[in-house]
Design a protein with these regions (language model features):
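Sensory/regulatory domains in signal-transduction proteins
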Residues: 2-165
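Short hydrophobic short-linear motifs embedded
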Residues: 167-206
Length: 208
């Protein structure tokens, strides 16, 4: 993890979790993470695997140009990336495994032309963390999508669909100290022949 939002949210999640596989949704005190909420979201794990947003931070609403709450999380991503995102969400829930990733956003082309702004890419760090909900383990997921830097179009025009850059499960050493160690666990997404490969196994487990 590189972004302070990711690090702070993970540390808070870890304190709530204690010896459990994941903390409960009701354990979260918004006041304790008020400085993070603009970049945070909560996803419901539904039977249809649409993954509706149950909480969506104000900066994410600004990114997408409207209220994100209730919208399917997968709709925020390019068609080509949705299978990987869905598999990552299920891996987090089924394996109680935190996942960190990178994404990229551009201003929507038509809107950027009308508003006379650039389409310069804005880079994000994605963090996905498992939650329990009223004791159920396959119910909710806590996440953050935090931007690196600023671009002139942000908040003025909506972003196009997010582009997934990378996904990986957090290593044991990284979970202990946020040291950035990556060798203990294989990445979820690998670059081979110019593309990512993500294989989904029964029960939502995923391997590269």
């Amino acid at each position: 993890m590189r972004h302070s939002v990711s690090k702070d949210l993970y540390a808070y999640w870890g304190r709530l979790r204690g010896a459990r596989a994941a903390p409960d949704r009701n354990d979260i005190d918004p006041g304790a993470i008020r400085h993070l909420l603009a970049d945070c979201f909560i996803v419901e794990i539904d039977q249809a695997c649409l993954f509706p947003l149950r909480l969506c931070g104000t900066r994410l609403n600004a990114l997408w140009g409207g209220e994100g709450r209730g919208a399917p999380f997968l709709d925020m991503w390019r068609d080509a990336d949705r299978r990987e995102i869905a598999a990552a969400l299920l891996t987090v829930i089924d394996g109680a495994t935190p996942i960190v990733g990178a994404a990229k956003a551009h201003a929507r082309a038509a809107d950027s032309e009308q508003a006379d702004v650039s389409r310069r890419a804005l880079d994000f760090e994605l963090l996905l963390l498992p939650l329990r909900h009223f004791g159920k383990t396959r119910s909710r997921l806590l996440g953050s999508l935090a931007p690196f830097g600023e671009v002139d179009w942000f908040g003025r025009v909506p972003a196009a669909k997010l582009e997934l850059v990378s996904l990986r499960m957090m290593s044991v050493s990284e979970r202990r100290g946020f040291t950035g160690a990556r060798a203990a666990r294989p990445p979820l997404a690998s670059q081979e022949s110019g593309g990512r490969h993500f294989i989904v196994y029964e029960g939502g487990k995923a391997r590269a």
